């Protein structure tokens, strides 16, 4: 948990230093949720898949909750910090880089922020920490994913 606490503190203090258009290529691949290392509510299973090419991020999230319900979220958007439509009607997402190993995602529906994620690569790019916030900026959860 020390790593999660240190990363959370760092993410909240680091200024935006990297260009918004420079993707974090080390995020490419599949990531599995480690629920035991995560904080706050989380599904029993969650997989993130990133396919990043210059200027574009393809993202797929699949999950299973405690009741067996399945979740799916996916997009293919330019990595430029601007709002782009997702596959959910009325929803947009934007992705921008905050630092060498940190990106910031804003999800909106009908022009209102619904959630944000700060994603940080740690442990030699083998661990991805995702900090989820609601539309008002309150931290909902900190999820730890391991590279597959």
Language model feature labels by segment:
Residues 22-148:
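Hydrophobic small-molecule pocket/channel-lining residues, especially in calycin-type beta-barrels
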Residues 1-5:
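Positively charged n-region of N-terminal signal peptides that target proteins for export
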Residues 7-16:
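Bacterial N-terminal signal peptides
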């Amino acid at each position: 948990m020390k790593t999660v606490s240190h990363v959370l503190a760092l993410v909240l203090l680091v200024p935006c230093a990297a260009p918004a258009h420079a993707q974090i290529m080390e995020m490419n691949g599949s990531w599995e949720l480690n629920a035991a290392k995560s904080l706050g509510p989380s599904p029993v299973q969650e997989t993130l898949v990133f396919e990043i090419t210059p200027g574009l991020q393809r993202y797929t999230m699949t999950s299973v909750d405690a009741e067996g319900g399945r979740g799916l979220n996916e997009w293919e958007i330019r990595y430029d910090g601007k709002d782009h439509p997702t596959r959910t009607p009325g929803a947009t997402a934007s992705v921008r880089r905050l630092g060498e190993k940190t990106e910031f995602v804003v999800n909106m529906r009908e022009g209102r922020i619904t959630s944000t994620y700060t994603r940080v690569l740690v442990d030699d790019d083998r661990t991805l920490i995702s900090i989820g916030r609601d539309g008002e900026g309150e931290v909902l959860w900190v999820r730890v994913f391991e590279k597959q």
